[in-house]
């Protein structure tokens, strides 16, 4: 069995097949050779039972909401309001980045979407205010991580579905730490 495994794996890698695809093909080949259970039926059952969960319907809606906020200009107006609210703080624009990331995280549910949206909106402010680009982008990257913690979080939904944990309890468990983390980010700036 080991000889067949290594031969198939090395053959796929020699053909310049990507490692992930090679391991997937290797798993299929080995399951057909050595397993009595049909793997294709098991894959179909797992995919169907996972996608048939009504809680996962929320994920595309969070993505759509984030896109609506960006395309409609609401994210830009939110960021502009935050820029006007915190200029009295030292590093006011950095605090605007973190606060905007926290507010957008509360609507999008995704760290990547939060960092990308606020980064897109905020990039024009670097030249206007003369901040260090490293520090400016660092606050956006740090604030973007709030998207996974501040509810509603896509990762919390997926975790709750997979572990059969109450999603409202996960949301309650993430809210206070998210606010504390945003406050600590602002304190660090």
Regions found by a protein language model. Name each.
Residues 1-10, 17-36, 57-64, 178-187:
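Hydrophobic mid-bilayer segments of alpha-helices in multi-pass membrane transport proteins
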Residues 98, 102-103, 137-146, 174-179:
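Transmembrane helix-bundle signature of multi-pass membrane transporters/permeases
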Residues 22, 96, 114, 135-139, ...:
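Signature of the 12-TM Major Facilitator Superfamily
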Residues 33, 37-129:
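Membrane-embedded alpha-helical segments and adjacent helix-loop junctions characteristic
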Residues 9-14, 28-32, 102-103, 145, ...:
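Alpha-helical transmembrane segments of multipass membrane proteins
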Residues 20, 91-92, 134, 168:
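Residues that define the loop-to-transmembrane-helix transition and helix capping
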Residues 158-189:
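Juxtamembrane and boundary regions of transmembrane helices in multi-pass small-molecule transporters
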């Amino acid at each position: 069995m080991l000889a067949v495994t290594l031969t198939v794996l090395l053959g796929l890698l020699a053909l310049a097949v990507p490692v992930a695809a090679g391991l997937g093909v290797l798993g299929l080949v080995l399951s057909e050779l050595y397993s009595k259970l049909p793997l294709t039926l098991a894959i179909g059952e797992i995919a169907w039972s996972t996608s048939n969960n009504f809680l996962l319907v929320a994920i595309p809606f969070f993505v759509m909401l984030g896109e609506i906020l960006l395309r409609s200009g609401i994210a830009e107006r939110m960021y502009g309001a935050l820029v006007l609210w915190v200029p009295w703080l030292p590093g006011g624009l950095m605090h605007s980045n973190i606060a905007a990331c926290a507010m957008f995280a509360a609507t999008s549910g995704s760290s990547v979407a939060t960092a990308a949206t606020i980064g897109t909106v905020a990039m024009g402010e670097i030249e206007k205010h003369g901040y260090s680009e490293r520090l400016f982008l660092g606050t956006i990257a740090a604030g973007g991580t709030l998207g996974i913690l501040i509810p509603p979080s896509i990762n919390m939904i997926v975790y709750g579905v997979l572990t059969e944990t109450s999603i409202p309890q996960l949301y309650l468990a993430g809210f206070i730490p998210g606010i504390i983390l945003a406050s600590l980010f602002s304190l660090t700036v």
